[in-house]
């Protein structure tokens, strides 16, 4: 294949994207499979152009705290170094007082958001009810800190509660919302292709269930985020299938005028350093490959940007320097201060667990772009 025969389709695709049109899945795959550095530079420039057009030059961040309330989990995802059995060394399960104390510390430090998720612990019940356990945490947090935005419980956790108690997803989500949950994290998405999920997270909900729960949340008025775990066994085609499903889910929310939608897309590159050996050995790397992550970051902006405008890198996984570079590849948000983080750190990530507002603002300023604190839903 000649150089010009490779260049022509890529430039045509990028011109189409710049015109404001949505790309097809096939066109996105062509971009991801591009290896010519000159063309990759054009992909970056197009993503940066669209980012500027769709969200402006301001880079946002949120002052938040992660609270991972337990790592006791019934599942055994092949990428996860966080989960433990109840009697295993390193297992933890925070009580209500400890959770409230962490939230109080976060509020003292200026946090507007608590992001809360945990392992799937069948013993986390009150009088035999899983939902009641989660509701007790939420009600006590909101009673103590009514103005705090509670971004809590992934679609996987919603399904777990529903299964344990024999409830519908709608009942679980509505109950959490009524108790004070303000939005759901779009984690546990990993790759929304069941062929991949059967290898990396066979016990997790399938792609259709993840999408159903997210759609139900939107219909009930709860915003969600969206994520993708990349850089392991998935192919470019499977990456695009994932993006396509997220875009379609957002289009459903927009076309039906649901009261809520997907607020952001976050790319989460696989960190293998301390991950279980089978997947770590199969992937053959301990830390993310920055160049691959940046190219996918750009293609995600180009493919999703018309419907999901806010794109965020993971500084925990890429480090602050890598995440700052992603702001040149289509991202417009640098995420949160976190204050603590266990899931990725236990997998061996080198990005750290806490950044100050000053550190985030300095990183943004290094690009000569203005910084602005935001709330959870932008």
UniProtKB/Swiss-Prot annotation:
InterPro entries for the chain: Aldolase_TIM, CofH/MnqC-like_C, CofH_family, F420, FO_synthase_su2, rSAM
Residue ranges of every copy of the Radical SAM core domain listed in the record: 59-306
Subunit structure: Consists of two subunits, CofG and CofH.
Keywords associated with the record: 4Fe-4S, Iron, Iron-sulfur, Metal-binding, S-adenosyl-L-methionine, Transferase
A Pfam short name: CofH_C
UniProt catalytic activity: 5-amino-6-(D-ribitylamino)uracil + L-tyrosine + S-adenosyl-L-methionine = 5-amino-5-(4-hydroxybenzyl)-6-(D-ribitylimino)-5,6-dihydrouracil + 2-iminoacetate + 5'-deoxyadenosine + L-methionine + H(+)
Record-listed E.C. numbers: 2.5.1.147
Record pathway: Cofactor biosynthesis; coenzyme F0 biosynthesis
Family annotation (SUPFAM superfamilies): Radical SAM enzymes
Phylogenetic classification of the source organism: Bacteria, Bacillati, Cyanobacteriota, Cyanophyceae, Oscillatoriophycideae
HAMAP family in UniProt: FO_synth_sub2
Name assigned to this protein: 5-amino-6-(D-ribitylamino)uracil--L-tyrosine 4-hydroxyphenyl transferase
Family: Belongs to the radical SAM superfamily. CofH family.
Cofactor binding note of this UniProt entry: Binds 1 [4Fe-4S] cluster. The cluster is coordinated with 3 cysteines and an exchangeable S-adenosyl-L-methionine.
Function: Catalyzes the radical-mediated synthesis of 5-amino-5-(4-hydroxybenzyl)-6-(D-ribitylimino)-5,6-dihydrouracil from 5-amino-6-(D-ribitylamino)uracil and L-tyrosine.
